């Protein structure tokens, strides 16, 4: 039996002697590498926090002391140490979530994958404890992987600093290798000294005594304070935390469990907000990750353990198509620039950055700033393309509405991972954008069905100079190209009923990547004698007027979209028909309006009846019901 086999909960961990902790850390890393190699996941960040997470669970009493993980992809080790070692189905249906999950364990307080939020949760929890007179619980927030580049984190820090008696320990996991831990004993001595109440009392007494001295008192205090601050700045980074009024200790070697435990205990016992700055190495202990210059295996699919090479996934990816076309457009138009929110490689902008390094701006995890900065770039005569995951666009809705659309600025938002993404669960499904963006004036939305249309629509979007545009596309492999058999206005017709059909039964509006499924449905219904027209609007906001005219020729209209059913394209189509006084039923087939558990995209679609079989069955019933109703409505002869 391995040492890891004996650890089932934090109490077991606390019983281990210090001498066995390095072995435990090594076994955890071996476990992570072997398991994530089969399932895929966030390997690099978790290899970097093994010792840190061990120390957290030895010092604090989880779940009584809440441990909040910002960018929750750092929580794999936390799961292991809290009794969740079944990683065989990590991020798969019925298995462990890739993020903290309240449904999984009482040790998980927040289901967190959108960054920069943990400190606000911590502030609220600590205020609640203070208000209720609870003085023996410490709130711990682990932030890192760029979370402190988000403005929300600094808003929270500013508020946390006001609570002088709130028990909050903020652990900054610094895996950016920006600071050197080889500062020596003097820095550790200063850190230990400052983390005592006696030191605080001594400072207050000395300050009062010096300031009371006639003539020279205040100038002398200012001079000594400046010397002290300058010395601290010289030997310690990140003194901005103390400028906010927060106590700071570090940097600490995050791979030295004993050193981290000492720092955490002093922070815990201080009884007020404290920053503990630890230095870790992303990908620690696995050479292929350590040597991976791009992102130290931040997130990846299944891979070969011996080499670190990913298992091949055949097929062209949507992100790759966007990446390639952006480089081509960049060569043709020098005014096209790109913005990313700490997602240069995942969103496909790395190639553009390599080709045009002066025309890419990585603003950190700051989507709000990205949107308004893009508006400024547009005002300056450029055309910015903001590449962001669809789920993260939610974070800057006000900026899109008021800073970009209100000013009619030509900004293109490229929304990657739109629709159901699957493996990463509720927080990463991009199923909200088509709904929330419907209300934005002056905004146009394009949804490509294949690689050819993604290239076309991206170019069309960038050519629009009197308002913002959105191009959304899913995660994964691009389906085969579906050629249009006809065009009506700006829409592509993908299927027509058999010749001789006077009045087609069904108009099937296929939104973007749902086109392939809709064409399969049309073929199934045709075998049953049901006449179906399949159209791809290409641009779903504003709707092409030709869609209304085409709908008038059919008995039923059905809209199939990879978005929440409420307030999206289906509702827009129904509203357009009502405005035209057309009494034609419109049925919307989209994602159920709930937070979805992690599973494969195809599996989730099938469960919701959004696969070809489920849609064909339902649409057959709808067409039959409509035909019966039409017969009943006919006047008696």
From Swiss-Prot:
Positions binding thiamine diphosphate in this chain are 73, 113-115, 146-147, 175, 286, 367
Query: Annotated Gene Ontology MF terms?
Result: 1-deoxy-D-xylulose-5-phosphate synthase activity; magnesium ion binding; thiamine pyrophosphate binding
Q: Give the reaction(s) catalysed.
A: D-glyceraldehyde 3-phosphate + pyruvate + H(+) = 1-deoxy-D-xylulose 5-phosphate + CO2
Cofactor(s) needed for function: Mg(2+); thiamine diphosphate
Q: Name one Pfam family in it.
A: DXP_synthase_N
Domain of life, per UniProt, equals Bacteria
How is the cofactor bound, in the record's words?
Answer: Binds 1 Mg(2+) ion per subunit. Binds 1 thiamine pyrophosphate per subunit.
- What does this protein's UniProt record list under function? Catalyzes the acyloin condensation reaction between C atoms 2 and 3 of pyruvate and glyceraldehyde 3-phosphate to yield 1-deoxy-D-xylulose-5-phosphate (DXP).
**Quaternary arrangement and interactors, per the entry?**
Homodimer.
* Protein's recorded name: 1-deoxy-D-xylulose-5-phosphate synthase
- The gene behind this protein is dxs
């Amino acid at each position: 039996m391995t040492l890891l086999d004996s650890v089932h909960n934090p109490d077991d961990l606390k019983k281990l002697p210090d001498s066995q902790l390095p072995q435990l850390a090594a076994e955890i890393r071996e476990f992570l590498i072997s398991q994530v190699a089969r399932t895929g996941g966030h390997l690099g960040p978790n290899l970097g926090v093994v010792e840190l997470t061990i120390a957290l669970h030895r010092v604090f009493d989880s779940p009584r002391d809440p441990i909040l993980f910002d960018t929750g992809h750092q929580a794999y080790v936390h799961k292991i140490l809290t009794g969740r070692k079944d990683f065989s189905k990590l991020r798969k249906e019925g298995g462990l979530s890739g993020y903290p999950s309240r449904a999984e364990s009482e040790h998980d307080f927040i289901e967190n994958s959108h960054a920069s939020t943990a400190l606000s949760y911590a502030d609220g929890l600590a205020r609640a404890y203070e208000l209720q007179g609870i003085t023996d619980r410490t709130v711990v927030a682990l932030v890192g992987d760029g979370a402190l580049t988000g403005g929300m984190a600094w808003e929270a820090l500013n508020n946390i600093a006001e609570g002088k008696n709130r028990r909050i320990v903020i652990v900054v996991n610094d895996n950016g290798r920006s600071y050197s831990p080889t500062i020596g004993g003097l820095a550790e001595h200063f850190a230990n000294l400052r983390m005592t109440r006696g030191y605080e009392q001594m400072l207050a007494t000395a300050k009062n005594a010096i300031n009371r001295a006639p003539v020279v008192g205040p100038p002398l205090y200012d001079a000594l304070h400046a010397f002290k601050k300058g010395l601290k700045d010289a030997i310690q980074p990140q003194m901005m935390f103390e400028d906010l009024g927060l106590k700071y200790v570090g940097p600490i070697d995050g791979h030295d469990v004993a050193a981290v435990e000492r720092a955490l205990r002093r922070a815990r016992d201080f009884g007020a907000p404290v920053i503990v700055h630890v230095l870790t190495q992303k990908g620690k202990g696995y050479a292929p990750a350590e040597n991976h210059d791009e992102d130290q295996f931040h997130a990846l699919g299944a891979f070969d353990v011996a080499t670190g090479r990913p298992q091949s996934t055949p097929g062209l990816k949507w992100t790759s198509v966007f990446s390639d076309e952006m480089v081509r457009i960049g060569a043709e138009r020098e005014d096209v620039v790109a913005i990313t929110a700490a997602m240069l490689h995942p969103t496909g902008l790395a190639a553009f950055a390599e080709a045009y390094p002066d025309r890419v701006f990585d603003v950190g995890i700051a989507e709000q700033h990205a949107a308004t900065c893009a508006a400024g770039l547009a005002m300056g005569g450029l055309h910015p393309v903001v590449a962001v995951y669809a789920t993260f666009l939610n974070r800057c809705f006000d900026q899109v509405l008021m800073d970009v659309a209100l000013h009619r600025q030509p900004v293109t938002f490229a929304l990657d991972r739109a629709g159901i993404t699957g493996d990463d669960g509720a927080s990463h499904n991009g199923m909200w954008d088509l709904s929330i963006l419907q209300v934005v004036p002056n905004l146009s939305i394009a949804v490509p069905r294949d690689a050819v249309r993604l290239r076309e629509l991206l170019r069309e979007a960038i050519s629009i100079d009197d308002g913002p545009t959105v191009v959304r596309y899913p995660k994964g492999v691009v389906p085969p190209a579906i050629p249009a058999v006809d065009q009506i206005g700006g829409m592509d017709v993908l299927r027509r009923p058999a010749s001789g059909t006077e009045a087609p039964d069904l108009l099937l509006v296929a939104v973007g990547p749902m086109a392939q499924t809709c064409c399969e449905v049309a073929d199934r219904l045709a075998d049953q004698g049901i006449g179906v027209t399949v159209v791809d609007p290409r641009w779903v906001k504003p709707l092409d007027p030709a869609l209304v005219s085409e709908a008038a020729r059919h008995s039923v209209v059905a809209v199939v979209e990879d978005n929440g059913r409420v307030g999206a394209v289906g509702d827009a189509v129904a509203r357009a028909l009502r405005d035209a006084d057309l009494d034609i039923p419109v049925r919307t087939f989209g994602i159920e309006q709930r937070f979805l558990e992690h599973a494969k995209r195809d599996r989730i679609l099938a469960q919701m009846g959004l696969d070809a079989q489920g849609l064909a069955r339902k649409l057959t019933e709808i067409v039959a019901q409509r035909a019966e109703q039409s017969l009943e409505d006919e006047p008696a002869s």
